């Protein structure tokens, strides 16, 4: 059985998260599809391609999703701020989930959801030809019927404004979950005094976000700049933790090898 055939038989990312599995995604900022594919071939459950602060473009996302799929894993795409058109394009390219940054109110959430879901739930237009090729479905009718359920929309919660409107955002039809960005959240929580993804004062709020998602029947995801925090986030109720950026992995790996070479 090929990796592609095996991937088609595996539960979707959405199904695994909704079943309560705790998953870990790698984080890809480098636009070379081979890097994303190599990360996917490790033990990560998914690979996130970052267009906001990473260096991914439309072309590299197209190729990166294919590389991740070739390794039998689902791809997640973080779009730039306000680029909801790119959310639809990422889905057309075969993304299993899209993360939208700076969703601060219901209007933002509705616009994002509209781009992510087909009518009548949303306004996504038809054109997922590449996604159909990469999917487990053999015909477009089945794909159409299942797409809204099998692809996930994560609204990023990064500001006090978003936190204050959290339940309203979670209540929007077509928003499947929230994704916390602890770095930006720490800036907001400290009123611009510091950037500290591990800021102790904001941890009760971070935990409250996961609890609110659970209460509303939605998913909670978060970025862990320090992989050592992943376990704590899982205990809070976060089902998806993204970590291990490719740039940091490259630097740490090279530094370790250099140290060993000099020691020998």
Where do the model's predicted regions map?
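N-terminal amphipathic alpha-helix/helix-capping segment at the start of soluble metabolic enzymes
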Residues: 1-25, 29, 137-149, 206-209, ...
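Hydrophobic faces of well-ordered beta-strands that scaffold small-molecule active sites
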Residues: 22-28, 47-49, 75-79, 98-100, ...
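Conserved, mostly hydrophobic/aromatic
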Residues: 26, 39, 50, 98, ...
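Short, acidic/polar
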Residues: 28-42, 81-89, 160-172, 225-230
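Glycine-rich, proline-tolerant flexible connector loops at the mouths of alpha/beta enzymes
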Residues: 35-63, 182-198
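Alpha-helix-loop-beta-strand connector modules within alpha/beta enzyme cores
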Residues: 57-92, 116-121, 146-148, 198-220
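C-terminal helical cap(s) of enzyme catalytic domains, especially alpha/beta-barrels
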Residues: 64, 106-122, 247-264
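Conserved anion-binding
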Residues: 85, 97-173, 184-187
């Amino acid at each position: 059985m090929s990796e592609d055939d095996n991937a088609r038989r595996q539960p979707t990312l959405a199904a695994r998260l909704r079943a309560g599995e705790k998953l870990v995604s790698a984080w890809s900022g480098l636009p070379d599809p081979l890097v994303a594919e190599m990360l996917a071939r490790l033990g990560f459950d998914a690979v996130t391609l970052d267009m906001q602060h990473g260096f991914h473009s439309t072309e590299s996302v197209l190729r990166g999703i294919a590389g991740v799929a070739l390794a039998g894993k689902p791809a997640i795409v973080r779009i730039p701020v306000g680029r909801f058109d790119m959310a639809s394009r990422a889905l057309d390219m075969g993304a299993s989930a899209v993360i939208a940054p700076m969703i601060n109110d219901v209007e933002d959430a509705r616009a994002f959801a509209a781009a992510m879901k087909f009518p009548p739930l949303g306004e996504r237009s038809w054109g997922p030809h590449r996604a159909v090729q990469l999917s487990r479905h053999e015909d477009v009718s089945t794909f159409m019927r299942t797409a809204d359920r099998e692809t996930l929309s994560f609204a990023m919660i990064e500001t006090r404004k978003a936190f204050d409107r959290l339940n309203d955002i979670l209540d929007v039809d077509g928003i499947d979950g929230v994704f916390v960005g602890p770095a930006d959240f720490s800036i907001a929580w400290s009123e611009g005094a510091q950037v500290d993804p591990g800021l102790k004062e904001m941890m009760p709020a971070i935990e409250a976000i996961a609890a609110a998602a659970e209460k509303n029947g939605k998913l909670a995801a978060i970025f862990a700049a320090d992989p050592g925090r992943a376990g704590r986030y899982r205990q809070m109720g976060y089902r998806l933790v993204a970590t291990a950026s490719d740039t940091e992995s490259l630097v740490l790996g090279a530094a370790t090898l250099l140290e060993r070479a000099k020691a020998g």
